[in-house]
Amino acid sequence: MTKTTAQIAPVATLDHLVVAATTLADGIEYIAEVMGVVPQPGGKHVAMATHNALVRLSERTYLEIIAIDPAGARPSRPRWFGLDDIALQAELIERPRLIHWVARATDIARRAAACPIALGPVHVMARGDYRWRIT
């Protein structure tokens, strides 16, 4: 007997989509124009010197608008999603862009170790009181 798709637990599920912009204000304005909804304030990712705004898409999925926080201290490592990349920064001057997606998984360390491509170490991140782990 084989399991149906509904019986197989997913390894990971979509958590959120990431739209990057040169400034958070530009990203919020762009999403308001194209989606007809105004993103809500998110917060600051101090370790990455980024800040964001959010649009809820479903019960457990959202759209994140992210930009480098000009008030933040430059991080000791490259910012996530390639935000420090000069080519990406040039593209974002033209308009904000959908640049990434993020999956939610249980036991991220085990999942990352089992991945056929190197995902890098698991880091604990925070935005205000909210904490999560990411590779």
Go through each PLM region and give its residues.
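Active-site-proximal cofactor/substrate-binding loop regions of enzyme domains
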Residues: T2-I65, D69-R74
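Vicinal oxygen chelate
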Residues: T2-K3, A12-T23, G43, H51-A67, R74-A113, ...
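Generic signature of intrinsically disordered, low-complexity segments enriched in small/polar residues
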Residues: E33, I65, L83-D84, R133
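Glycine-centered loop/turn motif at secondary-structure junctions
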Residues: M35-G36, W80, P116
